[in-house]
Amino acid sequence: MDDHTIDSESTEKQYNVAMVDRAMKILDYMLKSESTAGISQLAKYLDLPKANVFRIISTLEKWGMVERDPLFENEYRLGKALIVYGQKAKKDINLLSVAKPVLKEIAQDIGETANIGVLHENQIVILHSEQGEASILVSILPPTCSLHNSSLGKVFLANMPDSDIKGYFTQTTFERQTANTITSYDEFSKQKDQIITDGYSLEKEEWEYGLSCIAVPIKDSTGHLLAALSVSGPSSRMELKNYDTIIARLKQGADEIINRLSTER
């Protein structure tokens, strides 16, 4: 998100990790090459000792990013894991392109910030936010949110198997950011059934005092949870605008996104 962007040449150098940079150069070389590549060839390209290149290649092979050519044992090519990553990226890009106009409409209708988020490694990544007319006075949500104290997160948490929910709460100790913050499985279990049954999650000053958020799931025709859609704003304004009205508009938006995704396939 723009307010979290750090833009400077010195910062780029500071956070550049040499080993990761070299690994990416190997992948880029293989992408542009018309044939497979061997250790000697890559070592010459990177101007590195063969032993260093072999260690990088071995790690990439472990993660499926590269694989040995079945006809030439000491030659490598891009691995099939990249197909999975590419398909996931394509799906998120398609989702985002379809969701953006819907988010804009919701933000205009409600007058608050509309957000869409996806699950990534036990946290929510905010793919995009649109601000409504009144939402300019509200701090923008961070680029990631926790599962236990955000409406977007609680949608995903409620749809997980019970064993995974218990594991989430037992593996980490959560601090209360406000008096309303959920920090245990027992606390969340009181909300889980409501979230599933009613099809929405309400977060009322659990992340930050004065801020409330409502989210609904975006599920495909098979019931798979793709993302979550939310509206966030000052608690006082959200209550005045009527939660039921916001929930209905969010559910309508979720249906619109799914319908548009279906027609694009």
State what each model feature region is.
Residues 180-253:
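Extended hydrophobic
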Residues 2-93, 255, 260-263:
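N-terminal helix-turn-helix
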Residues 16-20, 39, 75, 79, ...:
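Short, structured helix-loop boundary elements
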Residues 3, 138-207:
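Short, solvent-exposed recognition segments
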